[in-house]
Every structure is written in C-alpha cells, then in structure tokens.
C-alpha cells in the first residue's frame, strides 16, 4: 500500500487501520495535533471506525534524547486521529508509546482495529 502525503506527514492504509509517519521532532507536543488533523482533513480522508483499537507510537531520535514527554505527544496525536481513524479515543484498548534511538528524527504511529475487540 502506497504512502500519501508530500510534506512532514505521510500515511497509508494497512490491514485493519492506518500507519502514519511524521518527519522531524519538536519539543512542543501541541504542534502535532493541528499538523496531523489538517493532514487527515485535506490529504488523507478516511471514515472513522467503531470497535476497539490498538495504537503503537514510536518516537525515533538522533543524538540527544529530545525533551518531549511521550504522554503529551500521545495525547496530541490521539486527539488528532479522533474523528478520522476512530470515532473516539475511548476506543483505544491498547496503547504502546516508546522512544528509541534511530536513523533519523521521526514519529511513527500505527493504529489498527483490535482483532478480538468489541464491535
């Protein structure tokens, strides 16, 4: 499945959900909510789904560990996905957030419908 988006945010449909890649990292978590929300509104229109979801958020960085709280980043990104990927963030049954050293500064989000989740 091919990626959509030419700027900082790209996304693609995957089985049961969506995968999002955001290039670069800033220390301001609130920066990500409008960035991702507008991307879904303008470039990657999908209908939100019901049922339980599993979300994996990985922040990759190069060099020093960024001064960005993962919990604030997760909240901003989940708020941006609400109404696009899932109807409400209360549908998230499993959430994994991780910060790892990587090859470049980026954030990856994978949100998939839970296989044995409720409808």
Regions found by a protein language model. Give the residues of each.
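Acidic, proline/glycine-enriched N-terminal capping motif
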Residues: 1-119
């Amino acid at each position: 499945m091919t990626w959509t988006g030419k700027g900082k945010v790209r996304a693609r449909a995957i089985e049961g959900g969506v995968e999002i890649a955001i290039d670069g990292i800033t220390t301001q978590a609130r920066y990500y909510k409008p960035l991702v929300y507008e991307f879904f509104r303008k470039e990657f229109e999908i209908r939100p789904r019901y049922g339980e979801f599993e979300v994996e958020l990985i922040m990759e960085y190069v060099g020093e560990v960024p001064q960005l709280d993962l919990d604030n980043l997760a909240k901003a990104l989940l708020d941006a996905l609400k109404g696009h990927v899932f109807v409400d963030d209360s549908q998230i049954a499993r959430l994994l957030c991780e910060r790892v050293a990587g090859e470049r500064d980026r954030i990856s989000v994978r949100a998939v419908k839970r296989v044995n989740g409720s409808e």
